């Protein structure tokens, strides 16, 4: 008796002929039924594991379940023993055995002209079906991860028919309670396991266009089973509209908002503060010195907003490494905060001493070393306001360029201010004599 996922057990005997391509055919099933929906178009040959292009844009065979897509690089696809078989109505626990097959998807060209490879997607096939139908359970095959229920016999193939995409839709992948999903992966919720298949893509495009016409004509919304790519933006726009904010206008940071952000950061405990443009490093933790010796001029202004900070954050220890990998010491200190008339609180310091070890194999090692060398003890070379020592003031009357020190800095405005003597000309002497002559009365008659 063959089992069909999502349906009750079939009453037909399992004496059907299994073709070489892995599709189960009954004695009364003709080959013409497969071309029923071609509408005069030439039938496309079925892709197999051997004929799959190197780009990986064709999924060989059809899985009964939706795929699991990787979204973080470097994460291994694995399940614990006894886990990893999807739930399917009509499939007993004794037939819950098979493998996950890695489908390497195609690459695409980005806007800047570079090629970007999509992360792989995994599909489940029951034991004895799919691209590795003849492989024994547990065989070491690249891109294959074997899973089985504890009640299943892995020495015999699963008595499950292959999926016919023309009559059976893929089942959304679900697991029993307690199953731990691989980290860095998510389950596809579209309900299709062959997104690049021509038949399913045409059917989905026709269905989506018909659905859009129906929605436009009726004015009602039809719920969809998939998650659209712009759903996050739509939700954000609805939230902003509810709050009375326009999502299209850029948010401007005013002095009032910057002050509120700074005060919000300063209200946190010292070890929970994250300096940024609105609340600088000096405002959060004080001036640089021997005990706080990290940060160049640019990083002190931007804080964690500095473009170089994320790569440094990779070196930061976790909470577990901080407590279990450091030397800790608890000390009671004097409370210098608060007024004298307020009740004094007991203040303690949890002092720590540890080290962060890394080597040249760390990704971005050269950049990390460059940033560390630029910011460690940078306060000793700084001449701006972040330096511990004030900027030396120039002495009064002193100029740059090695000029005479007795020369005034400001140029005199007139010869009177210069207070310098000069020789009298003949005209000046004549005027002086006229001023010295006594006044004589003029008795001439008019």
Curated annotation (Swiss-Prot):
Modified residues (Phosphoserine): 166, 190, 389, 421
Domain of life of the source: Viruses
GO terms assigned for molecular function: RNA binding
Subcellular location: Virion; Host endoplasmic reticulum-Golgi intermediate compartment; Host Golgi apparatus
This protein's GO CC annotations: host cell endoplasmic reticulum-Golgi intermediate compartment; host cell Golgi apparatus; ribonucleoprotein complex; viral nucleocapsid
Region annotation (RNA-binding) ranges: 52-193
Residue ranges, compositional bias (Low complexity): 9-22, 195-226
Protein modification: ADP-ribosylated. The ADP-ribosylation is retained in the virion during infection. Phosphorylated on serine and threonine residues.
Residues that bind RNA: 105, 121, 163
Region of interest (Disordered), ranges: 1-54, 157-230, 265-290, 381-446
Regions of compositional bias (Polar residues) in chain numbering: 29-38, 45-54
Compositional bias of kind Basic residues: 265-275
Dimerization: region residues: 265-384
Keyword set, alphabetical order: ADP-ribosylation, Host Golgi apparatus, Phosphoprotein, Ribonucleoprotein, RNA-binding, Transcription, Transcription regulation, Viral nucleoprotein, Virion
Family: Belongs to the betacoronavirus nucleocapsid protein family.
Function: Packages the positive strand viral genome RNA into a helical ribonucleocapsid (RNP) and plays a fundamental role during virion assembly through its interactions with the viral genome and membrane protein M. Plays an important role in enhancing the efficiency of subgenomic viral RNA transcription as well as viral replication.
Subunit and partners: Homooligomer. Both monomeric and oligomeric forms interact with RNA. Interacts with protein M. Interacts with NSP3; this interaction serves to tether the genome to the newly translated replicase-transcriptase complex at a very early stage of infection.
Name of the molecule in the record: Nucleoprotein
